[in-house]
């Protein structure tokens, strides 16, 4: 089989055919022809640039291009008309076409030889063809057929009929190989040339066979060549069609509009995908787990979960991801970039999904409701996590110690206890943290910002978690119950800490003195004893404290604030510990017993005072 040439993939239009096309079709023709030529050049097939391509690049009309001008091949020259002809065509047919094309707008009486040849013998190249043409014209002058639409003259009835078919738009010729129809035999022949060459190109990399356009695309995957460059931003592409799609980004044009919701898209494929959200259609199904998706790209991304593949690696810290979008979002942690800004409050975020979640704070919307207890949530993920409280599920297990967790985020945080790693450092004071969220919370200490306000009492907090914790005081809810002793807690973390009283577990150990604690907060507080650091200072009197909680309690001395009220008698206290002691008076309970005489007391301070009786007024040395 001969090699592919530009003539095999080029399509010729006459003036009347060209005028039947609308502007969009003409532009499509230009783009297709130019891309076909570029593809042939890339494959090393194309000869010197054909005149048709030069015309198209210059924006000229291609209809007046002669068929033989499509490629540069050695022509046969007619000495009389100096007309280039196809060598492979019959000269007889060629000469007739030359005469008819030259005089197509004249009457049939003008179809004769002009100056230059005294007789037929002098036109040696086309002698036979001329004789036949002359005979045809002289013997059948009454059978010259005229096209009423464009006044073209045809010397055969078949030619006239064939020409008229162009105006009717009928496509009588059908390709058996593909379901396509054509109105002209030449167009059908043209089409056949393309499909007969299918699989004639083989990839040297894998020996895979392709048709000519697929071969080009496949070849570019291996070479990495991207010849189609965007003049606007310099981005390069392997195919001209992809470049055309890309250009829409710069223009911002959105021609494809959803009739259902009015949303517009730059590409028709995006609109088709979008429509599935209204229809609920999910045609792309995962063979592994049966989960269905509305987009093929989402299915492809999903499949990496089963494969365990993580091809996208962060050059900064080495962390790997199964999606490029996740890597891009992760990189913002290192760069500090926050491109997604909330129009309501100006707060910026590293990714769009976090911004979307944040926006719910302003609307107060909670569309996701728990069927078990009726509690509502702003996000579906929060509802899913909440449901585990009722189910008691703990699907996430630590391979190091075997401990199980309800949430993957809690397991991730837990793992750092074993490694002792603290990758997140505060630029302000140099303090390091195990999680990014802990660093974010810490930074508020330096800024003093308090964005989260309680609608019930007006109190403001630096962190949303603190506000959530605070709200439980007003609600009086205690959802988390200890199965061992029945004691209930407002927060799951408090229940977990409480359980350690029964188990005696003390997982948090001080590296300095070896003392162990059941709570990480207690270990943190304890460590300050070794450093002697008192970083929390009272602005009123200058007194310094090791812990921020002590400073907060101390400030009440100056303000006179007593937020802790006894429900029994109405008496108020500055500190919760004092309120707890006070409540024992009403309960009549006496937890503190003197080992010397057996007397009971409801407060430890009363027992300490009592003991002085036995010691003779001397305070016991502990």
Swiss-Prot record:
InterPro entries in alphabetical order: GLI_C2H2-zinc-finger (IPR050329), KRAB (IPR001909), KRAB_dom_sf (IPR036051), Znf_C2H2_sf (IPR036236), Znf_C2H2_type (IPR013087)
GO biological process, one term: regulation of transcription by RNA polymerase II
A GO molecular-function descriptor: RNA polymerase II cis-regulatory region sequence-specific DNA binding
Keywords of this entry: Metal-binding, Repeat, Zinc, Zinc-finger
The UniProt record lists the keyword Metal-binding: yes
All copies of domain KRAB, residue ranges: 4-75
Gene3D superfamilies in the cross-refs: 6.10.140.140, Classic Zinc Finger
One Pfam short name: KRAB
Gene Ontology cellular-component terms listed: nucleus
ZnF (C2H2-type) residues: 228-250, 256-278, 284-306, 312-334, 340-362, 368-390, 396-418, 424-446, 452-474, 480-502, 508-530, 536-558, 564-586, 592-614
PANTHER family from the UniProt entry: C2H2-TYPE DOMAIN-CONTAINING PROTEIN-RELATED (PTHR19818:SF158), ZINC FINGER PROTEIN ZIC AND GLI (PTHR19818)
The protein's name in its UniProt record: Zinc finger protein 728
Organism, scientific name: Homo sapiens
Underlying gene: ZNF728
């Amino acid at each position: 089989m001969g090699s592919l040439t530009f003539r095999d993939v080029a399509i010729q239009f006459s003036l009347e055919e060209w005028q039947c096309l609308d502007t969009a079709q003409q532009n499509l023709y230009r783009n297709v022809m130019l891309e076909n030529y570029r593809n042939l050049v890339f494959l090393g097939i194309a000869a010197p640039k054909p005149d048709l391509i030069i015309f198209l690049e210059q924006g000229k009309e291609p209809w007046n291009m002669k068929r033989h001008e499509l490629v540069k091949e050695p022509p046969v020259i007619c000495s009389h008309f100096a007309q280039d002809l196809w060598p492979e065509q019959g000269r007889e047919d060629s000469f007739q076409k030359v005469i008819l094309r030259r005089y197509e707008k004249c009457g049939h009486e003008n179809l004769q030889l002009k100056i230059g040849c005294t007789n037929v013998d002098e036109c040696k190249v086309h002698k036979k063809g001329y004789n036949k043409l002359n005979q045809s014209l002289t013997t059948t002058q009454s059978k010259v057929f005229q096209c009423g639409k464009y006044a073209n003259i045809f010397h055969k009835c078949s030619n006239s009929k064939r020409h008229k078919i162009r105006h009717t738009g009928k496509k009588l010729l059908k390709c058996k190989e593909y379901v396509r129809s054509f109105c002209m035999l030449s167009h059908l022949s043209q089409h056949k040339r393309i499909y007969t060459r299918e699989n004639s190109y083989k990839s040297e990399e894998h020996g895979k066979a392709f048709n000519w356009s697929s071969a080009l695309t496949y070849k570019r995957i291996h070479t990495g060549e991207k010849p189609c460059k965007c003049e606007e931003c310099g981005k390069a592409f392997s195919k001209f069609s992809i470049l055309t799609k890309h250009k829409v980004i710069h223009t911002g044009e959105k021609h494809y509009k959803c009739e259902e919701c009015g949303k517009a898209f730059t590409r028709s494929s995006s609109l088709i995908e979008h429509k599935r959200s209204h229809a609920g259609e999910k045609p792309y199904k995962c063979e592994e787990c049966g989960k269905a998706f509305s987009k093929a790209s989402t299915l492809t991304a999903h499949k990496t979960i089963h494969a365990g593949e993580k091809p996208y690696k962060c050059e900064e810290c080495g962390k790997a991801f199964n999606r490029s979008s996740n890597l891009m979002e992760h990189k913002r942690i290192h760069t500090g970039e926050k491109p997604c800004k909330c129009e309501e409050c100006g707060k910026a975020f590293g990714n769009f999904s976090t911004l979307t979640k944040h926006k719910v704070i302003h609307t107060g919307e909670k569309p996701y409701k728990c069927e078990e207890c009726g509690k509502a949530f702003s996000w579906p993920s929060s509802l899913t996590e909440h449901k585990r409280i009722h189910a008691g599920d703990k699907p996430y297990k630590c391979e190091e110690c075997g401990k199980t967790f309800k949430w993957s985020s809690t397991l991730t945080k837990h793992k750092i206890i074993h490694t002792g790693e603290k990758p997140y450092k505060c630029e302000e004071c140099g303090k390091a943290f195990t999680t990014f969220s802990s660093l974010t919370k810490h930074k508020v200490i330096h800024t003093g910002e308090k964005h989260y306000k309680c609608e019930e009492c007006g109190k403001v907090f630096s962190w949303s978690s603190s506000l959530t914790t605070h709200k439980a005081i007003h609600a009086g809810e205690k959802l988390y119950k200890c199965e061992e002793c029945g004691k209930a807690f407002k927060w799951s973390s408090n229940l977990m800490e409480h359980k350690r009283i029964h188990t005696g577990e003390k997982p948090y150990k001080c590296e300095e003195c070896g003392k162990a604690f059941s709570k990480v907060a207690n270990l943190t507080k304890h460590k300050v004893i070794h450093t002697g650091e008192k970083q929390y200072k009272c602005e009123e009197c200058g007194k310094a404290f090791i812990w921020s909680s002590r400073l907060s309690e101390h400030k009440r001395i100056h303000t006179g604030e007593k937020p802790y009220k006894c429900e029994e008698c109405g008496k108020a206290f500055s500190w919760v510990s004092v309120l707890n002691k006070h409540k024992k008076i009403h309960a009549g309970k006496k937890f503190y017993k003197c080992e010397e005489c057996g007397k009971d007391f409801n407060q430890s301070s009363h027992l300490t005072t009592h003991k002085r009786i036995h010691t003779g007024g001397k305070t016991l040395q502990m």
